[in-house]
Structures are given as C-alpha cells and as structure tokens.
UniProtKB/Swiss-Prot annotation:
GO MF, one annotated term: flavin adenine dinucleotide binding
Gene it is expressed from: mnmG
Higher taxonomy: Bacteria, Pseudomonadati, Pseudomonadota, Gammaproteobacteria, Enterobacterales
Record-stated family: Belongs to the MnmG family.
GO cellular component, one term: cytosol
NCBIfam families: mnmG_gidA
Alphabetical list of SUPFAM superfamilies matching this protein: FAD/NAD(P)-binding domain
Function: NAD-binding protein involved in the addition of a carboxymethylaminomethyl (cmnm) group at the wobble position (U34) of certain tRNAs, forming tRNA-cmnm(5)s(2)U34.
HAMAP family for the chain: MnmG_GidA (MF_00129)
Protein name (record): tRNA uridine 5-carboxymethylaminomethyl modification enzyme MnmG
Amino acid sequence: MFYQDPFDVIIIGGGHAGTEAAMAAARMGQQTLLLTHNIDTLGQMSCNPTIGGIGKGHLVKEVDALGGLMAKAIDQAGIQFKILNASKGPAVRATRAQADRVLYRQAVRIALENQPNLMIFQQAVEDLIVENDRVVGAVTQMGLKFRAKAVVLTVGTFLDGKIHIGLDNYSGGRAGDPPSIPLSRRLRELPLRVSRLKTGTPPRIDARTIDFSVLAQQHGDNPMPVFSFMGNAFQHPQQVPCYITHTNEKTHDVIRNNLDRSPMYAGVIEGIGPRYCPSIEDKVMRFADRNQHQIFLEPEGLTSNEIYPNGISTSLPFDVQMQIVRSMQGMENAKIVRPGYAIEYDFFDPRDLKPTLESKFIHGLFFAGQINGTTGYEEAAAQGLLAGLNAARLSADKEGWAPARSQAYLGVLVDDLCTLGTKEPYRMFTSRAEYRLMLREDNADLRLTEMGRELGLVDDERWARFNEKLENIERERQRLKSTWVTPSAESADEVNAHLTTPLSREASGEDLLRRPEMTYAQLTSLAAFAPALEDEQAAEQVEIQVKYEGYIARQQDEIEKQLRNENTLLPATLDYRQVSGLSNEVIAKLNDHKPASIGQASRISGVTPAAISILLVWLKKQGMLRRSA
C-alpha cells in the first residue's frame, strides 16, 4: 500500500545525521519525511554525553553557520562548557560541552516537531524502491510504501548490528533497540562495497555508589562559552562539575588476566574499531609502559544518577567490568547500571559517493553518518546537513553543492571520505586540514553563512544578525585604523604601560593591536581607543583578523595556487588506461577511486605529482581541460 501523498525527500533514521538532514531539506522548502523506528529516541546520544572537542567543535560551528540544529540544541542542554586549547592559537581552539541527554533529546524533538514542511513517522524501514538505478521510495516494516524523489540513509550502527558483551553476542542496533537486518540485506544486493566496523561504549555507573570526596573536580569555564552564533550563556541550564579518577596496576592486571574472554582478542569481532577512542583493554595492551590512564566521570544529566566513565569503553564480560570499575579510586563500592559493550555494524565504502554524498550508482540515494565509516555525533551531523541539502536540491532539479577543503572542515571530511575512503571509524581532527588558520571555529559563520543563505538554509533572523556582525567588524577596524597616538601625546604614558617596548613613532590602534602583548580588551580600556565593541563575537574577529593578518594573507595565497588545479574536472567515464605515461599502479588506483577532480586524484595514495602532470597534459591535448565554478 502506498501512502497517499508523495514527498520530495525521505530521511531514514532519526539520529544526529538524520535530524540535521531532515531539518535542512525542510528548511529549503521541500516536503520532507523522517522515518524512525522510535520517535522517542530522536537525537539520542547513544554513547558519550558530550558535543564538540578538537576538530569536532569546528564541525558543530559550521553546521550552525549553515542554519543547523546541533549547536542550538547543546546550548539548551549543556551542563558544562569548556574551551579546549584556550592557551593556543585560534586555529586549534575548540568548544566542548557536557550534555544532559534528556534535555538534548528534548531540544532536538521540539525543533523537529515545529519545523514546517517536515513530517515524522514511526516505522522501521525494511526496503528501498529502486527503479532503473534510481531510488523512488522506501517500504516500512508494515508494508507501507512512501514515494520520494530522493532518499537519505542515516541508519547509524543499526545495519545488521551485533552487540558483544564478553563472548556472548546478540543482534541489536544499540542497547535496547533492534537492528535493521532486512534493510542491510537489501542494501547488500545493490552494487555497493560493504564492510564491517566496530565501536564500543563503557558501563554506566550509579553516582550514589561513587565516593566523590576523594576525587578531583573539573569545572567548566567562566564565563561560559556558547556554541551557536545565535546563542547566549543565559540559555544554558545549571552547570555541574565532572570528576577524575585513574586506572592502576590492579585494573591492568584484571584486564590482562581476562583477555581470553574479550571478543576482540578472541577473534569474535571482525570489525575494526576507532583508533582514537580505543577500548580500555586495547589501551592497556598498546601502552604497556603506562601504569595508569585518566578516567573522566561525567554526569549524564541533571535528573539522572548515571555517570559516564569516559575512558573505559569495553566489551569484556560483566563480571570483569565490575572488577575494572571497583579497582579505581572512589569506585570501590560502585554499581553498574548499564554494562559496556561493543557493537559491529555494516558500513558502505564512501568512495562510492559523490562529494554531495549521493551514490554514484543509485541516483537520488544519499548516505550520511556512521554508514559512511565515520564515528562521532558531530561528523554525523555535518554529513547529515550536507546530504539533506543536496537531496533537497536534487528533488528541486538543482545542481548539488559541497564545500572545498579550503572552505570548511565539512569539505575536508567529505573529501577524505569520498577520495580516500576509510578502513577504520573516521574522526575529525584539526590536523586533517591543510588550511587550519582559515578554518577556525570563530569564523565559521564568516566562511559559510552567506552560502547557507544562497542555498536556502539560513533564515531571516540569522541573516540579519550575521550582517550586523559584519558591519560591526568593519566599522571597528576602520575606527582603529584611523585612531592614532604619538610618543609625545598625553595618552602615550597610558599606552606605554601596556607595552614591552615604548612607542617610538606614531601608531594606530591596529598597529598596537598587532603587538603580541596587547589584547583588544586592553587596547579598548585605554582612553584613546575606548570604547570596546559590545558585540563580543565581532570584537573577537577584530582581534584575530588584525593579529594574524599576515599569516592569513599568506594562507589565502596558498589556497588560490592550489585551487588552480584542484578544480580541474575529471570525467566520471574516463578509462585511465587511455592515458599514456601512467604506471599500472596509478592507472589501477585512478580507475578504482574514480576521482571527480585533479585535486581528489592528487590525494590518492600512490598517485605521484608526476602522474598528475601527465594527466593535466593529456587532458589539455584532448581538449578536456575543464574547471568547476
């Protein structure tokens, strides 16, 4: 039976990728359907109760700059906010927030249920309707069929999910939820490369059984950071501390003595786990010289007694988990309320996707989130937004859009996935970006909000706030450029008190701000350069733009040089055996990856600069040298 109304876009799955995809498509005016197996778990934090971190916070800010949901939700649900790398340069500073799971899920659901053009329907999806290599709809568990011009798969760890606790295992999408086995089998019938990955989660502890009096506290920052460019600290709920404990030799002995009961070490788990979030058994074995590992005890919410022990993800049996937990200081009498576990699941090779996250083989079918081999809420949300907006554009007969590596961490993420693929869960770091100084958290809106407006993602309120900020930055920079102080002026003594070397010539406000010892706050506290901007975001931009102007200009030059070849297009049907001069290895890799551009080709392992030169010459001779806009 077909549902009476067709849709423009169908989203399958209501996690962090699915909710952003649904919101993006609906914001762009397309009739959107979000199918989920359980409406009550929309926006569920399946693992750690945190948003942000190094690289990840950058993605959240970019999603927000494009009108997305995640930053707004965490501002309403964050119970501890910190700036990581606060003492380092602005390129690597990152916002991180501890979340109240219930408040976060509530904020997401309220946003979804109040979004025009979006319908939510509770039913698991078991099949796709594919006609002539084009997806045209989805079939639910009860046989109800929905038609649409585009479908976005955001199914997380649910595809043929298998949960492991010790040597026991059972089918599951995550603890308490069924897997999606029929859909997994259906997708395996399509011409797509599929493999298995693994992730894990720690046991949850009853806070009433922990002796916090012997543990060090870790508080959030004051003043409190804010995630959304539209947010403010008054939105944050009550703030609470986290606590720190450590593993010890007793902990490590328990783990080493029970490795034969670990599904990972016993060879029961085939999927590869996340390199940068290893299980505690992995850490103990890989870092055998370490006699302790730091564990953060993170509250899961203001109305919950559950504690998330960040750092002891494990799939060891329950009795061993109890021994591990009780071996640590403050946890001698602790009780576990949910056991830790590992989960294996299907993922599909992202090299089979276009940069828009549309399948190269099934027209109108998009993939986003863990199904593409990534790990983390933030990576999923960013992909969801991109897939959702491109599904909306496809349904409106418009060309797809994807940011370049030089524009956004989202561009880095998608390019890495679509060009290189991944054999392990992919996590974003600032080190993955070549142009970190340009891709900062603080300027995500300056980089992306104008494009978001053109795409139809940014509403009038955000657009007005953005333009006001731009005007404030420009006006303040002009004021500082045109305000001068001379060594003989009355105000010189006050200025010199803040300088390591006194004034020897006339200096503008911008000249003084370029000095490493002078901050914007100090400068505008001086009578000659007061008052400071009330707009804190604009004030931050003024300081960063002035202090790093030379470095930013140099990096912009690098980007422009790189873009000359980056955007040279490669035909999707090109057989690289036609290109004389390429080695057999290069031919095989290019035919396997099918890069969309010279830039993508240059990042494939084994494709040398010499091979790129040969390819450019051949394209020119064939009259095929074309660049994307």
